[in-house]
A protein has these predicted regions:
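Intrinsically disordered, low-complexity Ser/Thr/Pro/Gly-rich interaction regions
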Residues: 323-474
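Short, well-ordered loop/turn and helix-capping segments at boundaries between secondary-structure elements
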Residues: 12, 256, 265-276, 293, ...
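C-terminal segment of classical bacterial N-terminal signal peptides
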Residues: 19-22
Length: 505
């Protein structure tokens, strides 16, 4: 089989073709003892890591479509706001105490504080802050076969290391945006290429793919050649890790932050002459084989920047600080409440149906902390009915444990619905049925939440979200407004160090 043919194969076709060819060769592939299922074959394709590195090294800013640049600005602005707000999260003070214990000395900005640190530790703390509230952007999946319809959080692993290195080097806004887009594109296409097994078996995609994105962004800012960029990917892959069991705990954002730190360190070590496997993506004992079992090389050989992930299938910006799988239901619930003027004291019960994948991920059915509430469909429905809003102030322990909130949570029945299941993982359908005490039933359904490519937020919408994040962080209004305007015209900024004073207390 020729290398170029692999890029055109689906998982099913790839499995069938490889098993047939190996059987013809007398390898005995597909003959598994004791009735066990034969694992999917692993593509024998060389040069994948090299191709990704070439994309990072050779892509010019002018190659990025203008609409992709503008979409990226929204995610960058959102990321800055969440970095500020994340220092007020429960994990924020702990991370700062941890930073103190490291005795880190450096000039890199720890956003939302008066502190500075060495670049790699600033990247760690800033990344944890962005992901702390689970309020950051998400990558949609391009294929129905991919589990859960979304793949990873693209900005949290990439923006912090890219920003601290741009700050260190005095890079321009254009240079930062190019590095950011390359990092996001690499991590998202790696996530897209992996077999669903990686996520299904418990790997946290943002944590295992994020180091590649961080390394890609920093490699471009450091102007590494192809060889050293390949080495950086080898280091990043070997340092990657993260598990879904940590969802709903502080360790979920720590996994993402650790990946940002590791991606930065990988580039610095590669620059200094460190060695690593230079074919880590496709190697027999490499990244894809270890975490996913198999993958589709076409996403990395043919589809980097063709189209850009921001262009298709798109990146969603969250209007609510909860798991993305809650957002279609939250968007529909908010619309139903407004349309029918539903009051909490009128509600007898709420029924929410979703797919098996959604139900298994939103596993906090009896939440008692703000973190648990982020992965609780029951809480998300309850708080909208009680307060008609669900922002950062609502996802706090004290709010979750209020008697009226707990009582409303018990009225919400969340379950697997056959119609939602049949819609497919790419739709994330939620079906809502509100029964009032009068007997009236109000119902609706939605497959896409506000902020998704199907229902996008404008730059001004994201600016309003940023203002809310800044207010939650008690950030000076004048600084917040200046950040909004600087990001709006980021490509005209000659030196990213102009942002330092605005993001540091």
């Amino acid at each position: 089989m020729r290398r170029r043919d692999f890029g055109k194969l689906s998982f099913a076709t790839l499995a069938s073709t490889l098993l047939t060819e190996e059987a013809r060769a007398g390898s005995g592939a597909g003959s598994v003892p004791d009735g066990k299922t034969c694992p999917p074959p692993f593509p024998k394709v060389e040069g994948v890591t090299a191709h990704v590195a070439e994309f990072v090294v050779n892509t010019r800013y002018e190659a990025i479509p203008q609409n992709v640049i503008e979409l990226g600005k929204k995610s960058i602005l959102d990321g800055f706001g969440l970095a500020l707000a994340g220092q007020r999260a429960e994990s924020g003070p702990i991370m700062l105490r941890y930073l103190d214990s490291l005795e880190s000395v450096g000039k890199s900005t720890v956003m939302g504080t008066r502190r500075s640190a060495s670049p790699e530790f600033a990247a760690l703390v800033n990344s944890v802050a962005i992901h702390a509230e689970d309020f950051d952007d998400t990558q949609l999946s391009a294929e129905k076969s991919k589990t859960y319809g979304l793949l990873m959080h693209p900005t949290a692993p990439v923006l912090p290391p890219a920003f601290v290195l741009a700050e260190k080097l005095g890079a321009s806004g254009k240079e930062l945006m190019l590095a950011y887009h390359l990092g996001v594109e690499v991590e998202c296409k790696i996530a897209e290429s992996m077999a669903p097994r990686a996520y299904e078996e418990g790997f946290h995609t943002s944590a295992i793919c994020g180091p590649f994105g961080a390394a890609a962004a920093c490699a471009r800012l450091r102007k590494l050649d192809v060889g050293k960029t390949r080495i950086a990917f080898g280091l990043a892959a070997s340092a990657s890790g993260g598990l879904r069991e940590e969802f709903g705990t502080m360790t979920k954002p720590f996994q993402v932050g650790h990946g940002a730190e590791d991606g930065y360190a990988a580039v610095e070590l590669a620059r200094l002459g460190w060695t690593a496997a230079d074919n880590i993506i496709e190697a027999e004992r490499g990244f894809m084989r270890a975490v996913a079992g198999t993958y589709e090389p076409k996403w990395l050989l043919e589809k980097l920047g063709a189209p850009w992930t921001f262009e298709w299938p798109g990146v969603s910006i969250k209007p609510y600080p909860s798991g993305s799988l809650t957002h279609p239901a939250m968007t529909e619930m908010a619309d139903l409440i407004k349309e029918h003027d539903v009051r909490a004291d009128q509600v007898a019960s709420v029924d929410v149906g979703a797919s098996q994948n959604n139900y298994q991920t939103l596993l906090s059915h009896d939440p008692h902390t703000g973190l648990e509430a982020k992965f609780s469909m029951e809480f998300c429905m309850a708080i909208l009915l009680l307060e008609r809003k669900a922002g950062l102030p609502q996802f706090q322990d004290a709010v979750v444990n209020r008697a009226d909130v707990q009582a409303m949570i018990r009225k919400v029945h969340f379950h697997v619905d056959p119609q939602a299941q049949a819609a497919g993982n790419d739709k994330m359908m939620s079906i809502i049925r509100i029964t009032l005490k009068s007997g009236q039933v109000i119902s609706g359904h939605s497959s896409f939440g506000k902020g998704s490519p199907a229902n996008p937020m404008s730059y001004d919408d994201v600016a309003d979200k940023f203002r809310g994040s800044a207010e939650f962080a008690r950030w000076p209004t004048a600084k917040a407004e200046r950040i909004i305007e600087l990001v709006r015209t980021l490509e005209t900024q000659s030196d990213m160090r102009k942002m330092t004073a605005l993001l540091r207390g």
